[in-house]
């Protein structure tokens, strides 16, 4: 029976890829046995309740093998993945896109495809489970008690981000993380002997992982025994399973020819004969469905029903905690952040926005019990430390400060996993110039609709002495180009509070907070509520203005100072703070006209970054005081002067407008 069910996975993959004329059959054919054992013997999921908070998580880190996952979801009874959807693999509007997409297909726990990120995301799942278990479980009530399983390939383990995350997971002793390594000695370009020869298990043992080897990837009993041993090890686990890529294909198995292209009609037929699969394309015998129904769906439904009863009993035993757990189960924050949770700020107060961020962050931490995060070894520079808590590790699971180490990329992917898990509000910080290291994870935050907050400090050439390696130039433009990402560059402490408030209210959009090292004065015109509009008026000489200055962040202080200097000479001028171009662009036409009247063509944008994003606002008649070259090393005041960020230079640019 099991062999028939394993082959059903293989041939759903072969047939769907053949029909779409696109896909990666090799991993589906080679990894089918381990995936079958995982789903039917280990994984605790309920196809009728795909979002069950305490389900085991499964991450196909080798996302190019998506038909492996879709086949399993279909056979297990997930309604989203009907046979019609299998036939529509990689087609417009289907539930079976080329790589798995969270939120698009029920049963997909994480978007994967960019190699390495799946393992790292799974690390976040495991850390989220551990924190929530420590927070809410009580004796006899394991409300949060699940494993996170991964299937990865050689390519995943070559990627640096998987090494970052594995090092971190070993340090944290995330013992509910189990990785099955589909070790087939083949990559897209040929054999791994030409590109990847280290002893992977020895490397993972050095990270503090339990490791095991299954020499025959078709031996279901050996695979199952290895998983059980891993779960009892007390460590994160890597199980190397030796497989044959394209298993069963007489002429292509064991070669890179089967990695990323359909078998072809002739080879698909030959594989049917070789594996004894006497069924037409997309035909699955009823006994296979019965196998998956009994061993995945019914087993999972029983586990879900038992858990639901446990939650009901928990309500009686621990009513206050149960209220928070009920909110988490419903996909809500256990406590709602309110405006009054932030301190009142007076005009003229001067503080770096990174410090203002720490004040807002700590105010939120006092209210939100499941708000946690950290920094890539820069907590006391990024100001991301929750003062009332210590560092989280295996011995201190309830602490909310996470020391990610100098692992920016892994930090982002781990945060994604924690956000995907549900029940948490998470953040991570680094210097803005190093946002490039984490950008691929930020992109997946946005693609998956995850409300992760990224805290990027030291946001401009005002860093000064550290020089061009540490002075962001193109970074704002790059982040603003990512769809479904809100970039907020607040002008002062008041706008910083508002930025945090918006980030903590977000349900499906990540936020990048871009913050200063240098002090900024709270302007009289800044407004907590108006930050949500993305742009608003902070200063004007009167209703008859004929010039508009636009600025973000620290340059709002400069814009107001320049406007006042020009006003003293008789200029009629308005200053607009633009903390978020994304939020402003989302406003209706009437509001945009109110803030930037079309009739007023004399416009100057001021930002210590690449000028590119501003031309859509200033037009052909306006100007941008920006930076389209790298920075320099010198005291900050000197750098700002040399690059033209002075009242005198801004005033000169305004006077030169037509």
Regions found by a protein language model. Name each.
Residues 1-32, 151-152, 156-157, 178, ...:
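Conserved acidic/glycine
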Residues 19, 51, 147-148, 208-211, ...:
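Short, surface-exposed connector motifs at secondary-structure boundaries
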Residues 89-95, 375-381, 388, 406-409, ...:
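Short glycine-enriched loops at secondary-structure junctions
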Residues 30-172, 385-386, 414, 418, ...:
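Cofactor-binding active-site loop characterized by glycine-rich and histidine/acidic residues
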């Amino acid at each position: 029976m099991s062999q028939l069910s394993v082959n059903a996975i293989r041939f759903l993959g072969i047939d769907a890829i053949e029909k779409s004329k696109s896909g990666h059959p090799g991993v589906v054919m080679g990894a089918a046995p381990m995936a079958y054992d995982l789903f039917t013997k280990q994984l605790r999921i309920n196809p009728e309740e795909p979002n069950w908070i305490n389900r085991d998580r499964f991450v196909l880190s080798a996302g190019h093998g998506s038909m492996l996952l879709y086949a399993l979801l279909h056979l297990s009874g997930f309604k989203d993945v009907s046979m019609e959807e299998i036939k529509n693999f990689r087609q417009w509007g289907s539930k079976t896109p080329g790589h798995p997409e969270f939120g698009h297909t029920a049963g997909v726990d994480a978007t994967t495809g960019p190699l390495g990120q799946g393992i790292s995301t799974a690390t976040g799942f495991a850390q989220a489970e551990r924190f929530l278990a420590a927070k809410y479980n009580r004796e006899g009530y394991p409300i949060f008690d699940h494993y996170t399983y991964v299937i990865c390939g050689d390519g995943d383990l070559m990627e640096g981000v998987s090494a970052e995350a594995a090092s971190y997971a070993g340090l944290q002793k995330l013992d509910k993380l189990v990785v099955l390594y589909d070790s087939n000695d083949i990559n897209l370009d040929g054999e791994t002997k030409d590109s990847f020869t280290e002893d992977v298990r020895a490397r993972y043992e050095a990270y503090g992982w339990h490791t095991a080897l299954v020499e025959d990837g078709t031996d279901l009993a050996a695979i199952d025994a290895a998983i059980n041993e891993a779960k009892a090890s007390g460590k994160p686990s890597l199980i190397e399973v030796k497989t044959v890529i394209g298993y069963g294909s007489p002429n292509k198995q064991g070669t890179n020819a089967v990695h990323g292209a359909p078998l072809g009609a002739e080879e698909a037929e030959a594989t049917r004969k070789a594996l004894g699969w006497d069924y037409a394309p997309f035909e699955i015998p009823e006994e296979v469905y019965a196998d998956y129904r009994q061993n995945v769906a019914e087993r999972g439904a029983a586990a879900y029903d038992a858990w639901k009863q446990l939650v009901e009993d928990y309500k009686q035993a621990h009513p206050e905690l149960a209220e928070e757990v009920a909110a988490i189960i419903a996909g809500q924050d256990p406590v709602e952040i309110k405006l009054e949770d932030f301190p009142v700020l007076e005009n003229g107060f001067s503080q770096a926005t990174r410090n203002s961020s720490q004040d807002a962050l700590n105010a939120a931490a006092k209210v939100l019990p499941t708000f946690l995060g950290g920094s890539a070894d820069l907590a006391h520079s990024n100001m991301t430390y929750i003062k009332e808590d210590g560092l989280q590790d295996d011995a201190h699971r309830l602490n909310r400060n996470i020391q990610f180490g100098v692992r920016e990329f892994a930090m982002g992917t781990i945060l994604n996993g924690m956000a995907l898990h549900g029940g948490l509000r998470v953040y991570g910080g680094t210097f803005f110039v190093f946002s490039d290291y984490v950008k691929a994870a930020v992109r997946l935050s946005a693609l998956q609709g995850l409300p992760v907050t990224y805290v990027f400090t030291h946001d401009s050439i005002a860093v000064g002495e550290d020089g061009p390696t540490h002075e962001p130039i193109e970074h704002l433009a790059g982040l603003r180009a990512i769809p479904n990402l809100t970039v907020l560059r607040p002008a002062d402490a008041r706008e910083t509070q508002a930025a945090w408030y918006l980030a903590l209210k977000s349900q499906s959009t990540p936020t990048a907070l871009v913050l200063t090292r240098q002090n900024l004065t709270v302007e009289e015109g800044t407004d907590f509520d108006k930050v949500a509009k993305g742009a608003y008026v902070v200063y004007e000489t009167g209703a008859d203005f004929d010039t508009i200055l636009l600025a973000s962040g620290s340059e709002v202080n400069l814009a107001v100072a320049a406007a006042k200097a020009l006003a003293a000479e008789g200029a009629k001028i308005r200053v607009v703070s633009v903390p978020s171009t994304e939020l402003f662009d989302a406003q209706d036409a009437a509001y945009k006209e109110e803030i930037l009247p079309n009739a007023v063509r004399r416009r100057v944008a001021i930002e210590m970054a690449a000028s590119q994003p501003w031309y859509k606002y200033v037009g052909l008649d306006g100007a941008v005081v920006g930076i389209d070259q790298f920075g320099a090393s010198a005291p900050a005041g000197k750098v700002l002067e040399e690059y033209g960020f002075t009242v005198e230079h801004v005033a000169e640019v305004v006077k030169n407008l037509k």
